Each structure stands twice: as structure tokens, then as C-alpha cells.
């Protein structure tokens, strides 16, 4: 049996992984242990379970995947109001009714955190994604609406840091200043912007990279993990790819992979 006592016949069973963020919801279809399809939806806090069921069935039709083959689904949400509606909607789609919401109680990870109930399920999923890759010392930088840093040492989740995301920073500037325009965020040619737009690009992107590099260096020093791998994930990780040497690997689907690993390695009795 694999870790967690899951019978072999369920190890690579088709499943859905749902990462519900503040801005977007990403649905991943796993089969044979690999991500087959991925869809990015707008997060709608008022969505009902009926609407969610209908949308998921539509996605399965588009992906030409019969829902009758699904064996499980896992949810990680930072929008608590959506957990119940997604859970109920997916229960009607997955024939086995095996739908699990990831949290600090059932993640199966050692947590060195003052108040584990406050840990976002997406951050736990990232830690599980590391476990699936056999990485025990790491800093995961998840670049989304917020930019989060998740620290794992010896397989134990320690916490991390939370900062405004790149786009969130821009919207805050635009909303609180009279003269700064909203711009399409682009990679700047140089740090010194010769126009307001270029200066914004520099501050938003290169400034963000500077924050990343400083925090990673400090985390490695404070936690005594100088060789910790740095893994970047999240929607904005694609934009920053190649702009910093601090990142060892870009894994845009790490959160989904962690949810897949969660289903495949944690017994239902722990849910």
C-alpha cells in the first residue's frame, strides 16, 4: 500500500482537484496520477451548489471525460463561504460521493504553527505538493492575489509570509493615488523607468522580485535551511520566470498536485 494506507486500486483513480482562490478557481482533472486538463474560472462567492454542479458537468463534457469514471474530488478554498456549496455540488457529480475539503486536521502534515486553523488550505496543498515530489526543505512562493511564502523544514510546515500580490499592489496604488494610471503589467527593460508606466512596471515586478529574494535569504538563515529549494507557483509565476535566480523550479500546478496527492495518500478515515 502507498503512504496513508490507500488501497492500490484507488491510487491513480480519476479525480478532480479544486483550488478556490479569491479571484480565480482552478479545476484540475487528474487521471493515472497526472494532470490531464485544467480550467480557470472566475470565483463567484454567491455561486450555488446547483450552479457548481452544472458548471463542473459542462467542463467534463468539454474535456470529453465521463463523470461516471470520477472516483473522488478534493477542495482547497480560501473563501470559506464557498466550501459548502462546492462540496455539495461535487457530491452530485462524483459517483462515489467521495469529496474532501483539505484543512489542518486532515492534511497529515506536521504543523509547527501557533494556530493551525488559520493556515489557508491552499498553503497546505502546496506543502503536500512538495511531499509528492520528495522535497523536505523548501520555500514555496505562490504568486496570486496575495504572494505567500510557505516554509517546510524536514517535512514540517513552519508558516511563512504573506504580502500583497503584484496586481493587488497595482490596484491599491491606482485606487489611492490621483495621478497613477492603471497599466497592463509588463516586464521592464531596466529598473529606472523613463515614463510613469515604465516606473510602475519596475516597481511592481522588479520590486516584487527584490522582496522575494530578500525574504528567501532571511528565511533560509533564520530556519537553518541554507539549501532549501525555492519553488514558484501561482498565476504570476509564469510572468516572473527567468527574472530571478532565486527560484529553483517553477511548478504552476503545485497546488492541484498537492490536492491529488492528498486524495491518493490520506485514508478517508482521516477526513
Language model regions located:
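Anionic-ligand binding region
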Residues: 148-189
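Gly/Thr-rich phosphate-binding beta-strand-loop-beta motif of the actin/hexokinase/Hsp70
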Residues: 10-36, 130, 136-157, 173, ...
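Glycine-rich phosphate-binding loop signature in dinucleotide/nucleotide-binding domains
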Residues: 64-68, 133-135, 223-225
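A generic "binding-loop/recognition-motif" signal
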Residues: 23, 105, 145, 236, ...
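N-terminal glycine/serine-rich phosphate-binding loop of ATP-dependent small-molecule kinases
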Residues: 1-106
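ATP-binding/phosphotransfer module of carbohydrate and carboxylate kinases, centering on a glycine-rich
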Residues: 2, 8-17, 43, 47, ...
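Conserved phosphate-binding catalytic cores of ATP/NTP-utilizing and phosphoryl-transfer enzymes
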Residues: 3, 9-10, 107-138, 260-267
